[in-house]
Amino acid sequence: METYILSLDQGTTSSRAILFNKKGEIVHSAQKEFTQYFPKPGWVEHNAQEIWGSILAVIATCLSEADVKPEQIAGIGITNQRETAVVWEKATGKPVYNAIVWQSRQTAEICEELKEKGYGDMVREKTGLLIDAYFSGTKVKWILDNVEGAREKAERGELLFGTIDTWLVWKLSGGKAHVTDYSNASRTLMFNIHDLKWDDELLEILTVPKSMLPEVRPSSEVYGHTVDYHFFSQNVPIAGVAGDQQAALFGQACFSEGMAKNTYGTGCFMLMNTGETAVNSNHGLLTTIAWGLNGKVNYALEGSIFVAGSAIQWLRDGMRMVNDASESEEYASRVESTDGVYVVPAFVGLGTPYWDSEVRGAVFGVTRGTTKEHFIRATLESLGYQTRDVLCAMEADSGIELKTLRVDGGAVKNNFLMQFQSDMLQVPVERPMISETTALGAAYLAGLAVGYWESQEEIKAQWDMDRSFTPEMEKERSEELYSGWKKAIEATKAFK
């Protein structure tokens, strides 16, 4: 009887179940979207029960459509939208409030207060993160402060907190396992990434009782088993957990120090494996835990670009320049260059290395000769420039020179963008055969824990390249274009 690993990929807009075989190939997948709630401007929430329902639905659909029996599942891996916070009652399993999503800015005031009190350096030192509404800690504080009776219940030990991975493991195990992994814990603002413990000083600042917090475990081990009534009478090991970006790094087999991947989704997330060293950043990067495996912890540097794929959506929906995102490649290729046009897509501010949330988008160098093609090309090129900004920060912080960049996410299908990316970085850009690297990473972590795959060496050998893009542009020309981008950034920041 052939066995499989089931990967549950719980994202920001949808939940997916993907079956992988021993070769790391996708056998079948199912997807279900769920509701986004925007109670006030800048707030984003999800219904945690609806997310749980969507997970049960995609598991059932995936197995039945693939004609795979529950007993053929050797293990379950979970990867998740990071930072999103859920607080629920231990006794009933009912959330006391909606899940507050990573994008939500509703705790911005709490963050400002913490910064004013001078906690920034201490938080940075312990967690590798910035004080920002993006991370989970202030979201938990907000729920305890704003939901009637929540703080009292928490003090009495009646409430539990978890990021989405924790919530799903708790539900799947019938409330037996309240755990998270190192990669997710490192995004909460409450976890000390050096001594690998929840930090009492941080919890005190955020006024979060320790009794609410899950146990932190490696990213690849058996955390518990599914209860039979949630998994068709089977007790399947839940054996791998990692946050989405770290799972993608693992799925791309970036196991050695200095290897990096960039995911081109709504935004871009670039992670570089820094080995067993937590590299502190002086250039606006986050220091984070990549994964815990075989008794060791691997760290990573992370850069966040807020607008990537969403800039192409803007060309389609806002500017009506293309009918489909895929057309952008064809339009961009019709012209030799942008003819001096730069688009800075700072629609929601700028991420790494600038961290400026006040700045807004701008266009430079427009003349009477500027056409739609120039504009589309300049928008695509902005993704390449922003990635170079992040890479420069990574090389400066780590002292590691990037040899190749592995890429994944929706926009990597765009050959023009991938070629420009290689030209801008002056290193090869490698696109894998399997673009579902996030789900694959979670599957690999689970499979290693249950012996489905023997070792990371076996996984590394499975990584298969679709295409490598190598630099075709002269280095001098690349530098010239990039210095124009830096000027455009400075001018954009000056306009407020």
Curated annotation (Swiss-Prot):
Disulfide bonds: none
Pathway it works in: Polyol metabolism; glycerol degradation via glycerol kinase pathway; sn-glycerol 3-phosphate from glycerol: step 1/1
InterPro entries: ATPase_NBD (IPR043129), Carb_kinase_FGGY (IPR000577), Carb_kinase_FGGY_CS (IPR018483), FGGY_C (IPR018485), FGGY_N (IPR018484), Glycerol_kin (IPR005999)
Modified residues (Phosphohistidine): 230
Protein residues bound to sn-glycerol 3-phosphate: 12, 82-83, 134, 244
PTM summary: The phosphoenolpyruvate-dependent sugar phosphotransferase system (PTS), including enzyme I, and histidine-containing protein (HPr) are required for the phosphorylation, which leads to the activation of the enzyme.
Any GO BP: glycerol-3-phosphate metabolic process
Gene Ontology terms, MF aspect: ATP binding; glycerol kinase activity
Modes of activity regulation: Activated by phosphorylation and inhibited by fructose 1,6-bisphosphate (FBP).
Residue numbers binding ATP: 12-14, 266, 309, 313, 410
An annotated GO cellular component: cytosol
Catalysed reaction, written as an equation: glycerol + ATP = sn-glycerol 3-phosphate + ADP + H(+)
Positions that bind glycerol: 82-83, 134, 244-245
Keyword terms, alphabetized: ATP-binding, Glycerol metabolism, Kinase, Nucleotide-binding, Phosphoprotein, Transferase
Binding site for ADP: 12, 16, 266, 309, 410, 414
EC number: 2.7.1.30
Assembly: Homotetramer and homodimer (in equilibrium).
Entry function: Key enzyme in the regulation of glycerol uptake and metabolism. Catalyzes the phosphorylation of glycerol to yield sn-glycerol 3-phosphate.
Family: Belongs to the FGGY kinase family.
Protein's UniProt name: Glycerol kinase
Source organism of this protein record: Bacillus cytotoxicus (strain DSM 22905 / CIP 110041 / 391-98 / NVH 391-98)
Lineage: Bacteria, Bacillati, Bacillota, Bacilli, Bacillales
